[in-house]
Amino acid sequence: VINQLKEEGYVIEAVQNKGYHITKYPDILTSGEIMSQLTCVDTGSTTGIIREVVYYDETDSTNNEAKRAAERDNAADGTLYITESQTGGRGRRGRNWVSPAGSGIWMSLLLRPDIAPVNASMLTIVAAMAVQEAIHKVLTEDGHDAECRIKWPNDIVLNKKKVCGILTEMSAEMDYIHYVVIGMGINVNTTEFDDSIKATASSLYLETGDHLKRSRIVAAF
């Protein structure tokens, strides 16, 4: 078990007559890592809207995974799909969203809301507010006074540079929603951007100078 944990990135030291002590936790986004931070110790139930986490080392798109699961497996409301990297990440209007491994949070939340389709657009705004608050919470805890704001309706900017984009997709009939998928891409520890976007895009690392543990942000969502 100790060797397996070390392979996963944990730094473990042996303490004489006491066993082992974990001195450094890896920046991983596995289902277990995220759920451990979402579960209430007293009740054993999850807090917030996320009920289950499905993790992939790599996928084409977490939005696609969520939609496939919703249609094929009747996946439950509150299921979060998250991956280390996407090969076909996308933003609004079909724009490509670069999603390299180990640098960001690429996730999609599946919802089955009991609301009219005409009101579904508000879910994007609610998601933007939740992401903004999660980023602000983590940065504040780490002593950063960065200016994190929502650029309505679906972008999060830090010091006036885009660090997060949100893509919402829906399957519905005229008066009934089958499901909504809210995809979120957060540039956390990204160190460089393509010349075509580096004037307007950034990451939490570039704006603060600190590498942040990604699972903390997911758990704060």
Annotate each predicted stretch with a short phrase.
Residues 1-3, 7-8, 116-148, 158-221:
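Long, positively charged amphipathic alpha-helical accessory segments at protein N-termini or as interdomain linkers
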Residues 2-140:
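N-terminal lobe of the biotin/lipoate ligase/transferase fold
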